[in-house]
Swiss-Prot record:
Superkingdom field: Eukaryota
The protein's name: NADPH-dependent pterin aldehyde reductase
Amino acids binding NADP(+): 21-50, 170
Tissue-level expression: Mostly expressed in seeds, and, to a lower extent, in roots, leaves, flowers and siliques.
Quaternary structure annotation from Swiss-Prot or TrEMBL: Homodimer.
Phenotype upon loss of function: Slight reduction in seed pterin aldehyde reductase activity, especially at low temperature.
pH dependence: Optimum pH is 7.5, with half-maximal activity at pH 6.0 and 8.3.
Family of this protein: Belongs to the short-chain dehydrogenases/reductases (SDR) family.
Binding of substrate, residues: S153
EC code(s) of this entry: 1.1.1.-
Length: 242
């Protein structure tokens, strides 16, 4: 198992065309990754809650008719189940799944975070990932192949004031990923991936204007896409960093 291993692969690595499912695809890292993968000739399957944002993304994807974007809420088990059926029917079983959908609490001490806000972070960041695993891993098992990337965070390996719910959710992702890695068949891989510090809406909610000092999602996506596309069964159980 690799702990917090940085990836330094070449951006021009040539890999076979893949079908990649990305949750939370309509903005931030998910959107940037989708655009980069499509540009490289891979098929993107994506989900998000906003149909308006999905429509906008569809028009920007290279070879836009090859991709499938669906409205779904990962917090809802039934929504993910329905999405899985639709994806298998229209595109088959994804080669790679990137569990990217996530949210963060407004900067607050834990005793100032409402129960509703705490639940929303956990339901999205932890239960949302579990829902995807529940419905897609059984589809991958018979093929004895498939890569699952669960987006973690530096705050899933450390702690920070004012974002305790988010930290807890990402620590959960680290543990969930390591445990599930021991449950899948040989040939598959489940990893936790710390994307690094990127200038997204989520970061802005924590850092304010200082978020603009960090790299943009599209620059990050070039490195992240190469890393994700080159993951193998040998990476199973890894705790990785872009």
């Amino acid at each position: 198992m690799t702990m917090a291993t940085p990836f330094s692969g070449a951006a021009n690595s040539i890999v076979a065309a893949r079908t990649v499912l990305i949750t939370g695809v309509s903005k931030g890292l998910g959107r940037a990754l989708a655009l980069e993968l499509a540009k490289r000739g891979h098929t993107v399957i994506g989900c998000a809650r906003s149909q308006e944002k999905l429509t906008a993304l569809q028009s920007e994807l290279s070879s836009s008719t090859n991709h499938l974007l669906l409205t779904a809420d990962v917090k809802s088990n039934s929504s993910v189940e329905e999405m899985a059926h639709t994806i298998v029917e229209k595109k088959g079983v994804p080669d790679i799944i990137v569990n990217n959908a996530g949210t963060i609490n407004k900067n607050s001490k834990i005793w100032e975070v409402s129960a509703e806000d705490f639940d929303n972070v956990m339901d999205t960041n932890v239960k949302g990932v579990a829902n995807v695993l529940r419905h897609f891993i059984p589809l991958m098992l018979p093929r004895k192949q498939g890569i699952i990337v669960n987006m973690s965070s530096g705050w899933g390996r450390s702690g920070a004031a004012l974002v305790a719910p988010y930290c807890a959710s990402k620590w959960a992702i680290e543990g969930l990923s390591r445990a599930v890695a021991k449950e899948v068949v040989e040939g598959m891989a489940v990893v936790a991936l710390n994307p690094g510090v990127i200038n997204t809406e989520l970061l802005t909610s924590c850092f304010g204007n200082s978020a603009s000092l960090y790299q943009a999602p599209d620059a990050w996506a070039v490195k992240a896409a190469t890393m994700i596309l080159n993951l193998t069964a040998g990476d199973n159980g890894g705790s990785l960093t872009v």
